[in-house]
Amino acid sequence: MADIMDIKSILYTEKSLGLQEKGVLVVQTAQNVTKNQLKEVFKTYFGFEPLKINSLKQEGKVKRFRGKLGQRKSFKKFYVKVPEGASIAALGA
């Protein structure tokens, strides 16, 4: 069972702000969270069931730091279709 703490943040980018107007929330989570676990988190903590959930893994970019190769952290993000009238004030959206 996933916990509310597995949701790291809501992503605020130009694309995600445009999607928010259409009722889609973009959430960054731990890499081991599944769609069904995220659905249970929304049911338990926010009181509604998402209409649709899409997921993707974002691999960390390989970057140079002081002449050596390093890699940014990889993460998983979900596009969550929220029903009309549902509120998720606990996450700040």
UniProtKB/Swiss-Prot annotation:
Domain of life: Bacteria
InterPro entries: Nucleotide-bd_a/b_plait_sf (IPR012677), Ribosomal_uL23-like (IPR013025), Ribosomal_uL23/eL15/eS24_sf (IPR012678)
UniProt GO cellular component terms: ribonucleoprotein complex; ribosome
GO biological process, any: translation
GO function terms (MF aspect): rRNA binding; structural constituent of ribosome
One Pfam family in the UniProt entry: Ribosomal_L23
Keywords: Ribonucleoprotein, Ribosomal protein, RNA-binding, rRNA-binding
Chain's role: One of the early assembly proteins it binds 23S rRNA. One of the proteins that surrounds the polypeptide exit tunnel on the outside of the ribosome. Forms the main docking site for trigger factor binding to the ribosome.
Subunit structure: Part of the 50S ribosomal subunit. Contacts protein L29, and trigger factor when it is bound to the ribosome.
Recorded family membership: Belongs to the universal ribosomal protein uL23 family.
Name recorded for this polypeptide: Large ribosomal subunit protein uL23
